[in-house]
Amino acid sequence: MQKHNIEVLKTARYFSLGTLNSQTKKIIFALHGYAQTADDFLESLKSLEDKETYIVAPEGLSRFYWKDFISNPVASWMTKLDREDDIKDSLRYLNQVFKEVTNNVDLKNIDVEFFGFSQGAATMSRW
């Protein structure tokens, strides 16, 4: 048996909290932990929301059912199977999210912060 890998285009999602505009002074990129989703994670960060802060929560590219097939799907950033490929794909995705969010923003007057929880922290440290 031979293993083959190919790169494919994948649709991924991320969530944001706040409004990115001329009042924005801080952008926070927040990466969820293992078996979470970006939207649920962002809910836990609502206390950081104010008119000067824009929070971006990318979601891990690998989804799965945490307990059974009737539960809501959750996500992870990597598994031990083809781990290096998962890491490479995640970094490519995070770079694209960063570029999309900051494309029309003058970052000279904006603090950009990075926050990761659990597996999100490990992913963040590689980014």
Feature locations, PLM:
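Serine-hydrolase catalytic machinery in alpha/beta-hydrolase-like enzymes
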Residues: 8-107
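Active-site signature of alpha/beta-hydrolase-fold catalytic machinery across serine-
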Residues: 43, 126-127
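Residue in the alpha/beta-hydrolase core beta-strand immediately N-terminal to the catalytic nucleophile
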Residues: 111-113
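Gly/Ala-rich beta-loop-alpha elbow adjacent to hydrolase catalytic centers
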Residues: 115-120, 124
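Class I SAM-dependent methyltransferase Rossmann-like catalytic core
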Residues: 2-4
